[in-house]
């Protein structure tokens, strides 16, 4: 009995020692292959989920096209000759409303003054244009009243025009009378021509070449002599054949010279498939000597790329009146007129999806 209990105690002590030794000894077993594989895959996934640092700049998000406005004036010679403040009130209003309308360009389609020999008329025009805010593009197209006779090449117009973007490299010839400018507005590439009175026809090939060079730009043709109340002037009849069909990116033509306001739309068939491919919106404005109804009228052309429209607003800051009473035969735009098929979507600065 005593020997049996002693043997049992020794056996239990030996078993405890063996268990203690097994637990304290370092593990010496191999990890199963499938476990190794899972652990490696997990480590690789963690490594891939952490991107390497890059020095490439983050691209700017694409901006949505926004509406922008062109302020259009013409034939202000009666105002500058009379020493009146009408012209100045027009440009001051354009400046005051720039932010609300997002006005990016002020255009004058000629006959800024009545007599190009009179320095005081030029001084009046300079004072009026000076009211336009810095940063706004300004383009003028010389009219017949703005130029001295052909034999006198030193026309004061070149010394007094307020054009902000004139570049001799963009001029038709060494006189610098006709030229073009480019800029971006509202997400659209813009190309604007200034064609001086008397150079319209000889500059036709040049206009077509520039339009081809800037084929991705929305082209606006600004000149003095092009239309009248009944149709096209002799110059306009030539340009409608030599320029408009050859330059598919021309979508707007602005002119003055003849009395009244008028609108014609041309719809050229550019690919000769028997269907119109674009609309060319052509407008004429000259109401400066209508003492009763026309004092101080200008037009705002609001371009909306999203809607592909041009809203034409007719307003006189002098009379504080919208809508000009157009003589018989003229346009009937009234206070506001929306022109569809502006063609703006073809010339966006961001690629279309």
Give the label of every model feature segment.
Residues 262-353:
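Binuclear metal-dependent phosphoesterase catalytic core
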Residues 118-205, 263-285, 298-302:
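Extended active-site neighborhood of metal-dependent phosphoesterases/phosphodiesterases
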Residues 24-26:
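Bacterial signal peptide processing site
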Residues 33-120:
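N-terminal active-site segment of His-dependent metallophosphoesterases
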Residues 20-22:
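C-terminal motif of bacterial Sec signal peptides marking the signal peptidase cleavage site
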Residues 92-105, 134-137, 177, 187-271, ...:
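His/acidic metal-ligating clusters that form di-metal
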Residues 67-77, 187-198, 220-222, 280-286, ...:
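Active-site-proximal beta-strand elements of phosphoester/diester hydrolases
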Residues 75, 110-111, 143-144, 224, ...:
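Active-site glycine-centered loops adjacent to acidic/histidine catalytic or metal-binding residues
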